[in-house]
Amino acid sequence: METLFCRSSLALQLTIATGNPIKVAEIEAMLGPLPLDVQRQPADLDVEETGSTYRENAELKASAAALRTGCWALADDSGLEVDALQGAPGLYSARYAEGNDAKVQRILKELVGSPYRSACFRSTMVLCDPSGSCRAAAEGICWGELLSAPAYAGGGFESLLWVREARCTYGELNAAQLSRLGSRGKAARALAPQLRELLHLS
């Protein structure tokens, strides 16, 4: 397969399939120092997540961004998986309820009386070439235990998942901890060597 490249100025351009600049900066930092011009996706690009797995959803987003920009594109999809709920909410984490408070309250209600609190955040990250074809994928998992009440107000599932190694909730992890312990950080670090090889980065 022919390898295509997209250049912005003198640097290869990589599109992160999100419109959130904070997430773009977060993923760029997680990938480590790379000679890339990292950009977010076009503002008017809106991809419906119709996949049946995290990977399928990530591929939909990365492929659409790659085809629109003509550049390599990276996307991720993630969710909270609760053992006592047979992996729910999983793929439907973002749509589990309207708003963070409602999501937290629904999870806590469904776990009433259950002694089993183990859960994890799972993320899958994919890389698509400019033709929209998926060329690499990686997964990251952060295990923890769900608290009986959120650690702080206004947070979502991340305010409930206690990460024992960090001695705080997922939502309280700092940037370095997110890269080392977080599910997205683990996926990004696992994908980085493949990205370097595919894009011929030194």
PLM features: what roles do these ranges have?
Residues 2-15, 22-202:
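Anionic-ligand binding patches
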